[in-house]
């Protein structure tokens, strides 16, 4: 295999210059994903809330064979029915909304929405990792679930469950060091911050905007895992979460 040129540009988010219609499955908008990926769940929640019929391609987490065609190897990757290729979950949310009714502002138009969409990646995503992978026991529980749901072969499932639990425990520990409070207390405080930004029923007021889908996807990936009780017991976030789940059926 030829080595990548040092001058070759790095892959980037947003709409890509080259269309790949052959990667649109059955002529439908197509998402390349892991079933349990929080960033993929952002996109799925928007697609399903809008009633958009789409194809879902489960990516092998080890080999990533299904994404060999793309320089961007992180999920989700989105390919529209016409072959338009979009990278990065928040950019995908903006693209889908813009091409399907334009119900929330574009990036750079609403600073509050931008702030809370960034929060989903920079703060909330890291906060839940610190809780889910708090110790080896909780890490093993999470990896048992992930390796059963995602597209792992039997051998890879066994290896990734046990070895992955050790690795993710280390990741969880490193994420915890990013915050001043212990993981559960930190997540509670982050949810408190979110609750102050939810106006009426949603971040977007009477209807959800990009911040709703971005943060819902992150928390949805936590459902059934260690620490989700923090979400369930929050006076503001749990009703909001329930509204988003009812709306998206994800």
Q: Language-model segments: which ranges?
A:
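GST-like domain detector, emphasizing the conserved glutathione-binding G-site
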Residues: 2-156
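C-terminal active-site "lid" helix and adjoining low-complexity regulatory extension at the edge
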Residues: 237-250
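Short alpha-helix boundary/capping motifs
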Residues: 74-76, 222-223, 241-243
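Helix-boundary capping/turn motifs
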Residues: 68-69, 186, 244
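GST-like fold's C-terminal all-alpha helical module
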Residues: 125-239
């Amino acid at each position: 295999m030829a080595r990548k040129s040092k001058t070759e540009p790095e892959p980037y988010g947003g709409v890509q210059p080259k269309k790949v219609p052959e990667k649109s499955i059955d002529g439908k908008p197509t998402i390349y994903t892991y079933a349990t990926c929080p960033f993929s769940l952002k996109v799925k929640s928007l697609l399903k809330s809008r009633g958009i019929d789409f194809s879902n391609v489960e990516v092998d987490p080890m080999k990533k064979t299904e994404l060999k065609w793309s320089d961007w190897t992180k999920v989700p990757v989105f390919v529209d029915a016409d072959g338009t290729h979009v990278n990065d979950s928040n950019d995908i949310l903006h693209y889908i909304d813009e091409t399907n009714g334009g119900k929330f502002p574009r990036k750079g138009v609403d600073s509050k929405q931008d702030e809370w969409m960034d929060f989903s990646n920079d703060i909330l995503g890291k906060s839940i990792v610190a809780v889910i992978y708090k110790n080896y026991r909780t890490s093993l529980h999470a990896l048992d679930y992930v390796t059963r749901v995602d597209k792992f072969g039997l051998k890879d499932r066994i290896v990734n469950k046990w070895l992955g639990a050790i690795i993710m425990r280390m990741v969880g520990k490193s994420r915890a060091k990013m915050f001043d409070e212990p993981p559960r207390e930190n997540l509670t405080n982050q949810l408190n911050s979110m609750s102050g930004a939810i106006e009426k029923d949603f971040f977007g007021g009477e209807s959800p905007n990009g911040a709703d889908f971005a943060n819902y996807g992150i928390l949805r990936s936590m459902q059934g895992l260690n620490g989700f009780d923090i979400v369930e017991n929050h006076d503001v976030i749990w009703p909001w979460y329930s509204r988003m789940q009812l709306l998206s059926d994800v």
